[in-house]
């Protein structure tokens, strides 16, 4: 007991005992706690948080996929309905050619089958179509990643939209061209109709607006030719009356030839009736040209002049006008046709006629007749 190593035990035996007991208790508590943790696992609150952290990204991906599938199906249905209305549905082999050139590609084959099913279904409900789309998309997801499917669907939608826009442009261009052609044809027809109506109206106005003096002169000439008695004889009367002062001198020769034609026609009415009608028509035309607007006094003077020329025995209260009868060169033989005159003879007679017209203004002429 007197050994120095045992001095501490003797001095602080109480402190040593209490300290050793406290250390032993701590070791036991720690061992028990670790043993409980291995049995029960983590705490419930911690497990819930851990589960939420793990489940959030998976739920989001599923929800996004569902939304995308619904939106895509709705867009496809709208496009198909519009294409069916306007008749723009593609053929069976054209869709597969657009997708891929490799015939053994499983993704393109699946898409082509899906498109054929969509085009073939017309009268089924939307629920069945949605289920079919979901199944097809699930199969495609198993075969390929979702990015490839989204890219292919976007490309298909772009192609369909481009085709629809091109077809609408073509239809609009054709409709505008047809409208232009119809407008041009209608304008041409309206112009033709207006021209025809204007021509008809002008013709009608010309027919209505005939000069009354010309009509009166024609009626008086017809009365004279009908009322004048026929003279019998073998002589040919050539009459001449002076032209008015307003007309030029060459018209005197024309008047002389016209009156001579009238006298020969009146003398030969019994022989040639056909020639008589032709001569009457010629005289009417020449009288209307030479006398464009005759007055009433001139018409009365003509009446008296023609009555004296056809039959000199007819009497009238008016004073006698100056006229002359020339002997015919043919003698007493009657003429059966029109007297033929050469152009040289007519040219030689023109200066004599002008001189004779001047003399007639100064002195009255006497009528001569050869029986």
Curated annotation (Swiss-Prot):
The chain crosses the membrane at residues 7-29. Residues 330-362 have a biased composition (Basic and acidic residues). Residues 277-287 have a biased composition (Basic residues). It comes from Mus musculus. Keywords: Coiled coil, Membrane, Phosphoprotein, Transmembrane, Transmembrane helix. GO terms for cellular component: membrane. It comes from the Eukaryota. It is found in: Membrane. It is a single-pass membrane protein. Residues 62-86 form a coiled coil. This is Protein SPATA31F3. Belongs to the SPATA31 family. InterPro entries: SPATA31F3-like. The modification Phosphoserine is found at residues 197-198. The gene is Spata31f3. Residues 189-222, 240-299, 326-371 are annotated as: Disordered. It holds the Pfam family DUF4599. Residues 189-203, 244-266 have a biased composition (Polar residues).
């Amino acid at each position: 007991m007197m050994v120095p190593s045992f001095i501490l035990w003797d001095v602080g035996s109480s402190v040593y005992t209490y300290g050793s007991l406290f250390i032993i208790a701590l070791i036991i508590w720690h061992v028990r706690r670790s043993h409980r943790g291995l049995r029960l696992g983590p705490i419930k609150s911690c497990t819930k948080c851990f589960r939420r952290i793990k489940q959030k990204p998976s739920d989001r991906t599923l929800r996004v996929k569902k939304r995308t599938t619904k939106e895509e199906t709705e867009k496809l249905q709208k496009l198909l309905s519009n294409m069916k209305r306007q008749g723009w549905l593609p053929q069976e082999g054209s869709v597969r050619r657009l997708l891929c050139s490799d015939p053994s590609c499983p993704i393109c084959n699946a898409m082509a089958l899906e498109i054929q099913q969509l085009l073939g279904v017309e009268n089924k409900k939307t629920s069945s179509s949605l289920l079919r789309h979901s199944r097809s998309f699930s199969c495609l997801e198993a075969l390929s990643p979702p990015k490839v499917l989204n890219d292919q669907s976007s490309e298909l939608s772009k192609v369909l939209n481009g085709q629809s826009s091109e077809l609408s442009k073509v239809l609009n261009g054709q409709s505008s061209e047809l409208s232009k052609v119809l407008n041009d044809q209608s304008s041409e027809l309206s112009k033709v109709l207006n021209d025809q109506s204007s021509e008809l109206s002008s013709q009608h106005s010309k027919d209505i607006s005939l000069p009354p003096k010309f009509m009166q002169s024609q009626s008086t000439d017809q009365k004279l030719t009908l009322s004048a008695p026929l003279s019998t004889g073998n002589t040919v009367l050539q009459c001449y009356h002076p032209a008015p002062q307003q007309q030029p001198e060459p018209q005197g020769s024309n008047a002389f030839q016209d009156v001579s034609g009238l006298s020969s026609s009146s003398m030969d009415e019994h022989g040639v009736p056909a020639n008589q009608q032709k001569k009457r028509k010629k005289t009417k035309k020449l009288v209307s040209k030479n006398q464009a607007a005759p007055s009433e006094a001139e018409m009365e003077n003509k009446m008296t002049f023609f009555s004296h020329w056809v039959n000199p025995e007819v009497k009238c209260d008016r004073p006698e006008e100056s006229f002359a009868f020339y002997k015919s060169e043919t003698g007493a033989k009657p003429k059966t046709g029109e007297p033929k005159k050469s152009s040289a003879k007519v040219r030689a007679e023109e200066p004599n006629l002008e001189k004779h017209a001047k003399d007639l203004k100064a002195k009255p002429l006497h009528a001569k007749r050869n029986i």
